[in-house]
Amino acid sequence: MEWADKYRPKRIEDLIVSEEIRQKIQSWIDAWEEGSPKKRALILYGVQGSGKTSAAYAIAGTFGLPVVEMNASEQRNRESMKATALMASLYADLGASDFRKPSKVILIDEADNIFESNNPKRGGDTGGVYELSKIVKETRNPVIITMNDFYEFRKKNYSSEVINNSESIEFKPYARRLDRNYNEFKKNVRNRIKWIINQEGFSLPDDIINSIIDKNAPDIRSIINDVEAAAVSQSSISQNNDRDTVESVYYLVDKAFKKNYDDTLKSIYGSDVDSDYFINWVEENLPSKTDDISDLNSAYEQLSFADHILWAIERKRHFDLMTFPMEIAGGLAYYIENPKHEYVKFHSPSYINSMSRSKERRHALNAVSLKIGLLLHMSGVESLNYVWFYRLMFKVNAGFRDTVYERLNLTQGEEAVLES
């Protein structure tokens, strides 16, 4: 799991925001918990990367409620807003102990991009914001609305109904050295970053941390991504640790091809192997366990399902469900009716194929983008847009490739990312 997701704020106390913003959020939460909110919706607006969505999830964590998230794209037109958002916001869960209390937090992300079109072929109409205005007036559950461009949203029909019935909080970018809050922000971010690095067992010089913060502020997610890349690129995993990981996944793969599911689950729950790494190993070694076409088809369908679930978990950030894809892949033996009975030694996936879906490749790509960013005087996130250029140049100009390798001091994994 990437550090930015692993250490996402869980409560409003974890947010790195000004005390003014924190107090406004807390007042809105208190009003809900007292059962008498005058404004049932909360609008969080500000530039992209300012922490609005993270704040929404932290607010839900403070409530102790799950999040129902809707991204306001082309699929969020009038009918879908009416069928999904209105139902979710008006009615408590069937299993709720008290129907008068909120049961969830409704998150409508990027509301300034709510799709509105009179063209029925594109599935749109002009009532998306109107339906949203009804939701914020009538909801029985807290509604959080995020938007990048508050003033663009104000131009939409019925937007005033939404705004007037919502508490609005601006996530302002700091004016760097001219703003005393920026120094406080930088101090808090630096302390959080040092804590994360220590938790992960890495170390990083203060000058690199400060440089990363200055280049990415106020986008904390980008800061953490670049810090992770820098920390990993400066550290080496010992041969013993590599061996332990291989032995652990080898053991799990062996279990997956044996019909003792309870034993397999115990091994999965006691392992620290990543889900994508495990699935990659199982997929690579499946043909060695059966050559029956029907068996292979059934087994690969299950692996595809596990991979899809893994994608959904990462997309929705439900990381407490990370073992679910492994549970699916771990039962593969029950889809193989005609197994090979001879002993076969499992082998690891090919280097590039393994990296393409593993944490190792993500770390390598992050490390490369950070190094390119330092070379070009931009953030690692921005420099990702230029990786394709380096890949192309390496293919047509060996001299350029050798110079870049020397300047960036790339590891073998980082070279593989640029040559793939």
UniProtKB/Swiss-Prot annotation:
GO terms, biological process: DNA replication
Subunit structure: Heteromultimer composed of small subunits (RfcS) and large subunits (RfcL).
Family: Belongs to the activator 1 small subunits family. RfcL subfamily.
Keywords linked to the UniProt accession: ATP-binding, DNA replication, Nucleotide-binding
Claim: Translocase is one of the keywords in the record: no
One Pfam family here: AAA
PANTHER family (alphabetical): CHROMOSOME TRANSMISSION FIDELITY FACTOR 18 (PTHR23389), REPLICATION FACTOR C SUBUNIT 1 (PTHR23389:SF6)
GO MF annotation, one: ATP hydrolysis activity
Record's function text: Part of the RFC clamp loader complex which loads the PCNA sliding clamp onto DNA.
Protein name: Replication factor C large subunit
Residues holding ATP: G46, V47, Q48, G49, S50, G51, K52, T53
Keyword Transit peptide: no
Organism: Thermoplasma volcanium (strain ATCC 51530 / DSM 4299 / JCM 9571 / NBRC 15438 / GSS1)
